[in-house]
């Protein structure tokens, strides 16, 4: 089994789909300028409708630390995913506040990850661009990691069998015409859960 996160939920209809498929986590995007960005009010609505077995991750870039902490303190999100510089001071601040942090990195700088969890992605997150899995095989991190970058129902099994991630993270790969697709979500969750033998991540995060 490989865990899976469905990223970029925007609508109540998206929550209905993931509640049926039961991925291990979902992502809500708060990063400025991103197509899938949602407001705190929308995120609160979605989180209240979400099955409590699914972990809630907030995705950030240049957001202020105060905004991130507010989302955690109001129980809208449980985990913070940061796309920022390697030495971003917010990582230490969040960890000091006992907030679980996922740090998004390219494979080239993965060894510099300072956060609780490592996510490997390409330089343009959410673009659907596929990572070079053959290259990643020779650069595979020692620690468990999350794999993102161009994953689809068609290539997910190959990706898992090549690089053995603990979790996969998908956004555009479960969309049709820019919206979440029920059939693709179901396929992705089913295939991820049926493939791989990895150490699960995020299991110790308290549900609230």
Swiss-Prot record:
Disulfide bonds: none annotated. One of its GO terms (molecular function) is phosphoribosylanthranilate isomerase activity. Pathway: Amino-acid biosynthesis; L-tryptophan biosynthesis; L-tryptophan from chorismate: step 3/5. It comes from Lactiplantibacillus plantarum (strain ATCC BAA-793 / NCIMB 8826 / WCFS1) (Lactobacillus plantarum). GO terms for biological process: L-tryptophan biosynthetic process. The keyword RNA-binding does not apply. This is N-(5'-phosphoribosyl)anthranilate isomerase. Belongs to the TrpF family. It catalyses: N-(5-phospho-beta-D-ribosyl)anthranilate = 1-(2-carboxyphenylamino)-1-deoxy-D-ribulose 5-phosphate. The gene is trpF. InterPro entries: Aldolase_TIM, PRAI_dom, RibuloseP-bd_barrel, TrpF_fam. Transmembrane segments: none annotated. SUPFAM superfamilies: Ribulose-phoshate binding barrel. Its EC number is 5.3.1.24. Keywords: Amino-acid biosynthesis, Aromatic amino acid biosynthesis, Isomerase, Tryptophan biosynthesis.
């Amino acid at each position: 089994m490989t865990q899976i996160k469905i990223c970029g939920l925007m609508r109540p209809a998206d929550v209905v789909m993931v509640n049926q498929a039961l991925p291990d986590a979902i992502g809500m995007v708060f990063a400025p300028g991103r197509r899938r960005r949602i407001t705190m009010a929308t995120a609160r609505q979605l989180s209240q409708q979400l099955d409590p077995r699914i972990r809630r991750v907030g995705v950030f870039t240049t957001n202020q630390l105060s905004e991130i902490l507010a989302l955690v303190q109001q129980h809208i999100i449980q985990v913070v995913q940061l796309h920022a510089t390697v030495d971003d001071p917010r990582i230490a601040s969040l960890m000091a506040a006992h907030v679980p942090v996922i740090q998004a990195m390219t494979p080239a700088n993965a060894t510099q990850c300072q956060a609780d969890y490592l996510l490997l992605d390409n330089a343009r997150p959410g673009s659907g661009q596929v990572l070079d899995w053959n290259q990643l095989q020779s650069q595979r991190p020692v620690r468990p990691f999350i794999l993102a970058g161009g994953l689809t129902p068609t290539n997910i099994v190959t990706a898992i069998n090549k690089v053995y991630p603990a979790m996969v993270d998908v956004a555009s790969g479960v969309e049709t015409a820019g919206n979440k697709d029920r059939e693709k979500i179901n396929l992705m969750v089913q295939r991820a859960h049926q493939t791989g033998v990895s150490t699960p991540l995020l299991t110790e995060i308290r549900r609230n």
